[in-house]
A protein has these predicted regions:
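Conserved GNAT-fold acetyl-CoA-binding loop/helix
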Residues: 17-42
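Conserved beta-strand in the GNAT
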Residues: 55, 61-69
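A short beta-loop-alpha structural element at the N-terminal edge
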Residues: 4-16
Length: 88
């Protein structure tokens, strides 16, 4: 199976939200996902973006994602925080 990694684009947000819901179900907390597709689109398009997302694809099928965001540490400076890494 060939797997490719790419930056998520607006057209990927419905599939991303489905994967987020799958992850929440796996963690036995499906009711905790309050996020909407509209919120994902808005926050991804913010300047600067509220998060960054890479998706793993095999053909047209999205197999997983890595969602991250930048933060700042008074001890270390700029950091990248990986919020979730999920692969089916």
């Amino acid at each position: 199976m060939d797997v490719h990694i790419k930056k998520a684009i607006p057209a990927d947000m419905p599939a991303l939200l489905n994967l987020i819901r799958e992850l929440a179900s796996y963690e036995q907390a499906p009711e905790k996902v309050l996020l909407s597709e509209e919120t994902l689109l808005r926050d991804a398009a913010a300047d600067p973006p509220c998060f960054h997302c890479l998706i793993a694809l095999s053909g047209e099928e999205i197999l997983g994602f890595c969602l991250s965001w930048f933060r700042y540490s008074t001890w270390r400076g700029r950091l990248l925080y990986v919020e979730d890494l999920y692969v089916r």
